[in-house]
Amino acid sequence: MYSNLIAQRARGRLARGAALLAAWLLLAYCGASFALGDAQTPTSGAWEYLQRHFYPDRDLGLLDESYMSLEAPANTPDPAATPLTLRFGEAAVGHIKQIRVIIDNNPSPVAATFDVASGARVAEIDLRVRIDRFTSVRAIAETTDGKFEMRSTWVNASGGCSAPPGAAAAGRLGDIRFRASPDAKSMLISVLHPNNSGFQIDPLSGEPIPSHYVSHIRLSTDGRTLLDADTGISLSENPSLRIDSDRPLPAPVTVDIVDSKDAHFNASWRGSVAESAATNTAAGAGGTR
């Protein structure tokens, strides 16, 4: 039942994402123009469309950086694995309902949508994304009282969505690894997965590599959902996610993952060692070692 609910949610997001991607590609084909907004941050026709789609008639406020910040390298050395860091200040922790990460000029601009459980003490989220061309990267947070906060930064990069896949890592599809800080307030989770974008070319055959990507991640602590993440092709190969809290994350920390081929992977970290790995099957059953 639990895995079916996750799969249904993932399939619904896939259908909506396909419609959004089609509309975005039409917009890009017609030629999105660039301009400078009030804060002298480059904007585009893509963002104007996305704002109308996700946040019609919403005031995307800007409190000071102590409430929320977004960090990304202005010139990324690897456009296929560009690090992003979202930090939430004391006033924000426990009061964030949803965070959406948008990369304006990517073929699939919504990199991730995080639904945060009520009262969850999420202080930082780190992830790696693909950057297809020079773009604004945005994080929009919805607070528990219905307000919205946006941060944006400009990244100079190109080719991240069509970059050839890297060398195969040791392990097999769906292997999940955990790395916790000594105080258990920070947890790094990574999964072995190609996260193919559909824009890459097989260097041997010259044929396009079909898209195959992680579409949903659920993170739970001590049996309670901490956050749900709907993801897509804008995540890097072998996606990783780091969550920081202002309190120790209670074990077990469990991860449930669904990909675009409806393969299910899950694993749990029991808190006995600083680093552990779990090997999973594509049938939805996983184990911890």
Indicate where each model-derived feature is located:
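Sec-dependent N-terminal signal peptides
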Residues: 16-23
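N-terminal signal peptide c-region/cleavage motif recognized by signal peptidases
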Residues: 30-32
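N-terminal secretory signal peptides that target proteins for export/translocation
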Residues: 1-15
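A general "mature secreted/periplasmic domain" signal
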Residues: 34-184, 188-254, 258-288
